[in-house]
Amino acid sequence: MSQRLRTTRLALARDFASQSRLRLLSDGERLPWGRRETFESDPARDFGGLQQQQPAFVLCPADIEQAQAALRFLYDAAIPFSLRGAAHSPAGEVLSDGGAVLDLRGLSSLLPTASPDAVRVQGGCHWLSLCLPLAPRGRAPRVLTDNPHTTVAGTLSVGGFGDSSHRFGLQVDCVRAATLLLPTGQRCEVTSDDPLLRYALAGRGQLGILAEVSLPLWRRGWALHARVLHFADVTSFVAASIHLAETQRVDCLRARAHAVPPHAVSAVVGTYGAELDPALLRDLPYAAISEPEWLDFLAHAQQAGPPGWAPYNPALEVVLPLPSGLGLLSELDALAHALGPERLPRGYSLQVLRGRGASLLPLVPLPDSPWALIVALRPECQTLDEAQQVQARLQALLPRVAAVGACVYLASFPVPASLVEAQLGPERATLGELKRRVDPKGLCNRGALFGYVLA
């Protein structure tokens, strides 16, 4: 990107920002959100840390009208732009080299609804900020990720899975309606049967900004009565998880694989607001079980604050078909053991949920099998050289991902076009058609689809 073009774009943006009273950042200024000296406030970095791209400028709209004005300006000026929330992305999806970054965390309001069992929330709101006012009312989102310090629109743009996905599927499956801002600035009110919303959910920002969404709420308290089940191997964990998912009587199922003998997987299993019935766990193939205790993940998240990550975090998160993907899981597990606890201090996440047939959405990153297993490897590295070496080892597994019919959920590196096309399947044509309709100049979130550019 030439310095002359950067300078021209910045001059145009300063004029626009001055006239519209919209906050503009440039020349390495930090974002007004997040912890200092971390990727959270650095517009040139994201969670992955393996890429650094300096935008010509950043626009920080404070409401939907400002976001629309920013989009119209960017589109009229033909300036490519990336949409940024909490930047919990590993491959530079929220970065821009010489273009613009649109930071959406100013769109963070909770809006009134007629029903106590629904919520309307703006896309830049953190999940934690959504949950805190719901808790005293005995309400919760149906699915919540294990890191609530991410934005609503950010997780909905990729899918979003959590410890109740065995009951309700992905977070995108819960969206009932939305306000979508198209890349041109046009505002669209869409419902769950509208193709624009159906392809915006898990669409990685290709169709614009999820400015507001309507979500059904779960009537439950936040006190979780739980036990920790330890499994000698992943096969036993998968069998137990499928049984618990089929019974639909356990509210929470949160698991991590680790390298602490003699247990391969440990899973928190529990129910909200009532004691966990021991009969629900009878005959499950666990190797050991803890005494029951009461937990409050919301209070813990509020007290602990955002996770402390290493400077560099290469990542590969895949969704495996069951049982055919268990061979690849063995390879992923072998790599995790080789990387060791210094790079995977928390182990890695596992989640069993139903496959693609359980979702009505076209872009959900789920295989066609009845059951699927999400495996999330996010090694922590202290140097860029170390991270690049680890990333190369993760990247080497992509041919196996394709061979078993698995889906990539997140990756810190570009995914081969053939694998992206296979994952999108026939839905690629419809997504491409919608993209050309709402973003004819191809300015919004270029490359955010695993590095793939829709033709």
Region spans (language model):
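Structural signature of FAD isoalloxazine-binding scaffolds in flavoprotein oxidoreductases
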Residues: 59-60, 90-111, 164-184, 209-216, ...
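A generic structural signal for well-ordered alpha-helical segments
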Residues: 17, 74, 83, 134, ...
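Glycine-rich N-terminal segment of FAD-binding domains in flavoprotein oxidoreductases
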Residues: 22-31, 38-146, 159
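Short, hydrophobic/aliphatic alpha-helical segments
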Residues: 66-79, 132-146, 186-201, 391-395, ...
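C-terminal substrate-binding/cap subdomain adjacent to the FAD-binding core in PCMH-type
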Residues: 157, 176-327, 334
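Conserved glycine-rich FAD pyrophosphate-binding loop
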Residues: 5, 12-13, 96-98, 283-455
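Intrinsically disordered, low-structural-confidence terminal and linker regions
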Residues: 1-23
